[in-house]
């Protein structure tokens, strides 16, 4: 069952050729300009000014942003600082904790294995994770946190794992006993994916699979399945099959010693001092400088704006970039198509997903009805974000994407605007009417 994933000779040759390409030689190299990309010059100038103002107002310490349409870069700019404490400037080479923007990368990896016929959407997860064969579901609990458990009636499927309706918790929020168990057993601080799976297997599901949507540990489980099916470590699979072919030379699960000065720090607003301050490093998770840290498919990657823009353009191109094909067009379309029943609410989401007119595909939220979502974006726009504020969206009706890279968690300046909405609204007003 768990056969090793085989690289084709052509893919391997492409990978070897692309691995010699430098950062400066690969798209996006420079701006084509607003007009060449299909926007008004005034609109893109307004976008750049708005993002610079957000930095100047100390809503974030620094930012890098790229807007591209039809493969042409309308703007690729930087502003502010990567680290306040040593006044290091933000640059196009800056590295970021992308947290949950790791998830779409994991989804692409799993879809590559789907194309190999190694799993199907209706397969039970336990076919690939035997530890999940006897899962229990929490039906109720009392004030003391004591749960009433029952055997799962319908074992969760791969489809439900991919759209967060399988019933797993996460531990990022929630005061219920399931999420408390995730925190108490330090699931997300596991040393490796095998340990993570062992811990998750001991925690009941929050609900019967398919009955609700809950943002969950599902994508870490997906990473484990990639590892199990491919016979490689998860990191090795990503490196060989996604990062090297796409020339994503800055993307991995840790920061190399030679890249430490490029690594941005996380900041938040300090109300007492009335300014942004640099946050201390977390002590409950392994350091990003540790090459042996958990290869978390749900939130572990470090990347640059340049690298992630290449990943996004591959998706805009329906699976291909610079002659390197990663996925088939059909697989990309599956990923960006809502697979939830209309009545399921996207609760527990860190983004605006869960509003009317939105659903979920394979590790992306999807805007299925822009009018209900109160968005100017086209139907089928898909997006996600990271816990430190990084965000992106892709509008397939315009062959367009935006990526914004920041590092911010915790309190924000009172009155700070929603920079994502500010950017989005300016961009769509800049298109030909």
What are these regions (language model features)?
Residues 1-4:
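N-terminal secretory signal peptides that target proteins for export/translocation
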Residues 8-19:
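Bacterial N-terminal signal peptides
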Residues 20-24:
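Sec/Tat signal peptide C-region and signal peptidase I cleavage site
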Residues 25-29, 35-98, 118-120, 134-141, ...:
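Short, conserved catalytic-motif segment at the N-terminal edge
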Residues 45-52, 65, 71-73, 96-125, ...:
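Active-site SXXK
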Residues 83, 130, 134-377:
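Short, surface-exposed loop or secondary-structure junction motifs
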Residues 392-393, 399-408:
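Short, well-ordered beta-strand elements
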Residues 408-419:
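A short acidic/glycine-rich loop-to-helix N-cap element
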